[in-house]
Amino acid sequence: MRNTRVLISGASIAGPALAYWLDRYGCQVTVVERAAGPRPGGQAIDVRGPALEVCARMGVLEEIRTHRTGLRGMSMVDGDGKELFSTTERTASGGQLDSPDVEILRDDLSSVLLAAGGDGIEYLFNDSIASLAQGPDEVAVTFHRGGSRAFDIVVAADGVHSSTRALVFGPEEKFLHHMGGYLGVWTVPNYLGLDRWEVIYQMPGDVWGGMVMSVRENTEARVYIGIDSDEPPAELLGSRTVSDQKRLVAERYRDARWEMPRLLEYMWGAPDFHLDVAAQIHMDSWSRGRVTLVGDAGYCGSPMSGQSTSVAMVGAYVLAGELKAAGGDHTAAFAAYERELRGYAVANQQLALDNKARKDAETTSRGQEPDTNPTDIGDGFYEVVNSYTLKDY
């Protein structure tokens, strides 16, 4: 296999998964990550359908199951804490509880994937790609912390706001499809005493209310908030610092009741606070020359699809497999990768568009009344989830 020097930008989910497979196939893999180390925090994410088989082939399926959230159900409350709805059949974050899906915290899944890669993979934390120049035989890369190196292939696995994608394909405004909202997440103590349980608080206005779920054997909880806004990220978030973003959330939630005031107090000291746009990435092509995209950087489905993580893991498997099948011929491999996966990625993006349209219609018809069926994922969800079968490479 030729073209074995591969640089991957991003060390969250798609990056470590791709690194695992490329290392297994004999590549010299380097992963560069802007953060100083594995990033803590993030929402609970779901591993479904063929992504479960990817985990099984990596030998980590049982381990991720040991880290699953293990929620027993969910309830909804009003501003006074009165229960409006309760179920032990499903949750808003993870869907049907009797499914084979694995709901796991983003940072837990990332840790498992990073560990699976072993010592053969080089990780460069606290750094990122400053520039790259493609030549006929290699890509010359310079890093923000200094120094330059040559690689045969560069893969952007650095998410919706991929700086690597911007260097090669142009600014994200060309590719970002705004879904009309922003999602915030942070960790708090489980002071509510939730026992593998999820609670949703809904409120009227331009916010989605709040959600709290106990995690890690009830030792802590994750808080979710949502803001309705069509403002592009460059305007709503722009150059705002994390402290500025927290002030934005506090201002939007100034009239919130139930436990939201206390949860917002915890937000101020939360080191893992994260606020970002709910968006999709639509690309006419996933590759240009010796550079290609994987996961959210190329085909993010948004949190509204419930499938971004799974599609990213499948994408990593397919990209590595097609490189192996092509003997390292990046031109042939990138074309085969996109042929193989684009239909699945687009179908999963459509899930999010359908879910948003359905929820918008329900909100319009419901008015200010609380949603008492907040976790219905719609017909055909699992048909799409399971519509792709992994190839053997």
Task: List each language-model region with its residue ranges.
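Short helix-loop capping/hinge motifs at secondary-structure junctions, enriched
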Residues: 190-196, 232, 259, 284, ...
